[in-house]
Amino acid sequence: MNKWVNTRGNQIKNNPSIQIQELKGEEIHYGRADHLLEKSDFSHQLLAVLTLSNERDKSVAIRSLDTLWSYYRYSMVSVLDWELIANTTCHPAEMVPSRLHLLWDEHAKIGEVSAVVVHPFHQNKKIGTQLFSKMHTDVALQEFDAIIGWTINPSMKHIWERHNYEKIAFPWKLYEEWLAFFEPLIGREVFEKNAHCGLFIHPKHEKAKEEKIRSALASL
């Protein structure tokens, strides 16, 4: 069971603001951490990486997107893997570096990771920097079938495009929700000018897989 805790280390399971969803029989606990928003630098991005090259049930990974994208409104996620990581926290100081390296160096390369999420406020930390520096290399980017990304930092979008990932836009309702959330924080003009969100698919993938992904996203 994944237990989300706040920066004081207290469990927030019974907090009224918690949303509980189930994924493959596991309870996933969410907790609002609005007090962290003031510390967040929204020039950085919330990034999700979804590996689709493995032989696991692709529908499980696709279904997880609905849960995955609810995190944009919570300022608390460091690293999450749906099946391999059982417990993570909202504070980077509580993350174990070796756990991140285990995810990246061993599991990602053999296609076992369903999803990796890095919150913007962690990107300035040592752990986030290590992950993002690896993602900026040709070798790292070529290991992924698709990158699901949201950013108001154009540099990340340009990096994806430079590595020939094709952008597929997310449903408009998600963009509207993001706008509603971030407008009071950074203003509508800044958001609309800089926001980029979409699924970036590498052109090496067969058409059937691409159409399946498009169809799954359209159903969200």
Indicate residue ranges for each PLM-predicted region.
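Conserved short alpha-helix immediately C-terminal to the canonical SAM/SAH-binding motif I
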Residues: 131, 155-156
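Conserved GNAT acetyl-CoA-binding A-motif
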Residues: 139-152
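C-terminal "cap" of GNAT-fold acetyltransferases
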Residues: 174-220
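Short amphipathic alpha-helix that is part of the acyltransferase structural core
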Residues: 2-66, 70, 75-79, 84-85, ...
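Conserved acyl-donor/pantetheine-binding loop and adjacent beta-alpha core of acyl/acetyltransferases
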Residues: 56-59, 63-117, 123, 173-192
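Conserved acetyl-CoA-binding loop-helix of GNAT-fold acetyltransferases
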Residues: 118, 124-137
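Short alpha-helical
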Residues: 28, 154-155
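Conserved acetyl-CoA-binding loop of GNAT-fold acetyltransferases
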Residues: 161-171
